[in-house]
């Protein structure tokens, strides 16, 4: 029974890390598309848009990093 609970912990951590990575990839794709759309509509705002794009992209990219940290915690500290 204990092996089953360990396996479920490992699978839960893998699903958590995988879904966070997929969600961030979709979010960055949408964000990049909106950045290009905004840059095409108003080329004079490209420096402002670029700054905001990289700030938000960093925040979106932090989510999978946090999920990896939590997943490793679940796999090695909780187990």
From Swiss-Prot:
Per the UniProt record, the site (Reversibly protonated during proton transport) maps to 61
Task: Give the GO cellular component terms, alphabetically.
Answer: plasma membrane; proton-transporting ATP synthase complex; proton-transporting two-sector ATPase complex, proton-transporting domain
Q: Which UniProt keywords apply?
A: ATP synthesis, Cell inner membrane, Cell membrane, CF(0), Hydrogen ion transport, Ion transport, Lipid-binding, Membrane, Transmembrane, Transmembrane helix, Transport
**Entries under PROSITE patterns matching the protein:** ATPASE_C
Which coarse location class describes where this protein primarily resides?
membrane
What GO molecular function terms would the record report? lipid binding; proton-transporting ATP synthase activity, rotational mechanism
Localization of this protein:
Cell inner membrane
UniProt topology in membrane: Multi-pass membrane protein
The source's domain of life comes to Bacteria
Q: Kindly indicate whether the keyword Cell inner membrane belongs to this entry.
A: yes
Q: Where are the transmembrane segments?
A: 11-31, 53-73
Q: Which Gene3D superfamilies match?
A: F1F0 ATP synthase subunit C
Q: Does the keyword Kinase apply?
A: no
Q: Which is a Pfam family this sequence falls into?
A: ATP-synt_C
To which protein family does this belong?
Belongs to the ATPase C chain family.
Q: How does it associate, per the subunit comment?
A: F-type ATPases have 2 components, F(1) - the catalytic core - and F(0) - the membrane proton channel. F(1) has five subunits: alpha(3), beta(3), gamma(1), delta(1), epsilon(1). F(0) has three main subunits: a(1), b(2) and c(10-14). The alpha and beta chains form an alternating ring which encloses part of the gamma chain. F(1) is attached to F(0) by a central stalk formed by the gamma and epsilon chains, while a peripheral stalk is formed by the delta and b chains.
Q: What does this protein do?
A: F(1)F(0) ATP synthase produces ATP from ADP in the presence of a proton or sodium gradient. F-type ATPases consist of two structural domains, F(1) containing the extramembraneous catalytic core and F(0) containing the membrane proton channel, linked together by a central stalk and a peripheral stalk. During catalysis, ATP synthesis in the catalytic domain of F(1) is coupled via a rotary mechanism of the central stalk subunits to proton translocation.
User: What is the protein name given in its UniProt record?
Assistant: ATP synthase subunit c
Organism field: Serratia proteamaculans (strain 568)
* Lineage summary: Bacteria, Pseudomonadati, Pseudomonadota, Gammaproteobacteria, Enterobacterales
């Amino acid at each position: 029974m204990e092996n089953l609970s360990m396996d479920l912990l490992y699978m839960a951590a893998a699903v958590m890390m995988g879904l966070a990575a997929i969600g961030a990839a979709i979010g960055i794709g949408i964000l990049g598309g909106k950045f290009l759309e905004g840059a095409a509509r108003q080329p004079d705002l490209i420096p402002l848009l670029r700054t905001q794009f990289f700030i938000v992209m960093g925040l979106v990219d932090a989510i999978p990093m946090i999920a990896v940290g939590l997943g490793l915690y679940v796999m090695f500290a909780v187990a």
